[in-house]
Design a protein with these regions (language model features):
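Tight coil/turn sites that cap or link beta-strands
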Residues: 19, 27, 123, 139, ...
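Short linear motifs in low-complexity or flexible loops
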Residues: 21, 50-52
């Protein structure tokens, strides 16, 4: 456990330079909490920043952010909680999630902000984040019995963020065995800005109870908004 309670200055927990890798294996538990800066942060370079979590647990609780930078985060048969961040839970890492439980909840801005997001036979929850619950800039795949729940997000009414935003021209797929629930969020439920979303026959897709109370995303699409809004 790394706990910054009582620390002075603005320390980071783990700072990655160049081709650094963090490997958690064989039942390891890493808890990082109460850092005024980020739990995991890169140096902004072009190295291979990898976080590999296998048969283990990672918890980021009440830090400025959980994952800051463009990491390749591979999560296999593990549990990951990124909760209570002052800012984003993550901000653009690539997440490959398999046979795992992942929670990005109660973060001060976005929850699970990803480049590529692959969810395979896993449970992913993004709940009560002030920004988007899930935002994906590249390919998005939910497959092999995965269950994804996005609820209570987009709580900051000064933004026009949706609960789920699929941003660029990539394929987005929910396969026939999987479930995606986007419910009771505080703005548009699902925003498909570009690309193609395929929900296969047999999948469960439930988008209910989302509300739009302002015009920052053109004031439309409490359920689904397709096309360019005001770049949110």
């Amino acid at each position: 456990t790394m706990d910054a309670t009582g620390s002075t200055g603005s320390p980071h927990a783990i700072y990655f330079c160049s081709n650094n890798k963090l490997n958690l294996t064989n039942g390891s538990v890493l808890t990082i909490k109460n850092y005024p800066n980020d739990a995991l942060e890169w140096d902004g370079g072009d190295g291979g920043y990898n976080v590999n979590i296998t048969n283990s647990t990672f918890i980021s609780d009440h830090n400025r952010s959980g994952f800051t930078g463009t990491f390749y985060a591979t999560i296999t048969n593990s549990k990951v909680d990124v909760v209570n961040s002052l800012g984003n839970g993550s901000n653009g890492s690539h997440f490959i999630i398999e046979d795992s439980e992942v929670n990005f909840n109660n973060n001060g801005s976005h929850g699970l902000s990803a480049g590529e997001l692959s969810i395979d036979n896993s449970t992913v929850n993004t709940k009560n984040n002030n920004g988007m619950g899930i935002t994906v800039n590249k390919a998005f795949t939910v497959e092999n019995g995965s269950i994804v729940t996005v609820t209570g997000n987009a709580g900051n009414s000064s933004y026009g963020y949706a609960a789920v935003r699929l941003y660029n021209d990539y394929p987005f797929t929910v396969d026939s065995t999987s479930e995606l629930y986007i419910e009771d969020n505080n703005n548009t439920g699902l925003y498909v800005r570009q690309g193609n979303l395929t929900v296969e026959d047999g999948a469960v897709l439930k988008i209910t109870g989302n509300k739009v109370s302002h015009s920052l995303l053109d004031g439309y699409g409490g359920g689904i908004y397709v096309g360019y809004g005001n770049n949110y």
